[in-house]
């Protein structure tokens, strides 16, 4: 494979609502490949955990190429040269749900799941530490018993690395409007998976939770979700939250009150009530600051006919009561109104966002990274201090990216305070998961930004 090296790119553009040219951010583009599939957004969906992951000085990546083959790659973090392997595995790239998720365990084995939308589990591991050669593996099921192991109807697989070297694997069992959140744990010593929860969040056959989970720097797990009543995105409602301080075994509300599992619509802690028909996008994104205080973000409209905006809901003890409560920051409204309804993968004019929280001795800063069609389809960073909100917008990449959405290398952020984002210009059929668009393969790479 031929590689082209790009020089470091520096961007600073004046954009509404406020600009700050005194200390512009820098963005660096590291090219990976030239033949990534671009007819859907399957390679670059927001919130995937994760398509990029850094461990022990190596960054791993995965994508589908123009032939729908699963490709894995790695590079040393001090080099822009990638080792790239096209595997024998493939995926249904017409459907953007069928994203790739990977992680590297404590012994440097690569774990990967791919090609899921209400379909049987596909999971593989590397044959040796640091290797890109994969072998298909099983988690919990025996041949012919996938349904009994809740591995027959998998969607949204996500991997998480725990501080003790173990892994978590989360996914939805069942379809939209009738799905449950399943959680597995990988024991790094025995190299075996076990089931933690058959149903951590239960839709009771009437709805499903669209969730995001994060492991913070202190090892606390944060789980945020919205409910959807039917496959129609317009039935999304309410932001809810749970946390775990024992690697996912038990869960509690922000105030420490334990949950009785599974969590349901009636028992979940609602941190922000958002009615149906308010253009609430799923899933939310959750993260935490250095003191494990949770932050949750998504976009929605304040009324059914209003223009959507990003909202950040966060916990803080602003009243000095000794216990935190929930607060909300509202970003500026986007440039124009739009509708959000219907089935399938949507193609709205703004993407879902990555949420970053910088914690310093004296202040906290919030960053939202997203794509905005109203700003020429560019990659945007929207930033504000937490104490006295004042939003600043900066363009990180002056390039139209189609339906691109950001997902984060969480290890690079925790270790280096750098946002590493898989970057590719892609197309997406609105509401159509059966047919991709006839677009040529496109370049794929990594955008690196340090606030």
Residue map of PLM features:
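Non-catalytic N-terminal targeting/anchoring module and adjacent flexible stem/linker
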Residues: 1, 17-22
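Extracellular, repeat-based ectodomains that mediate carbohydrate processing or recognition
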Residues: 21-451
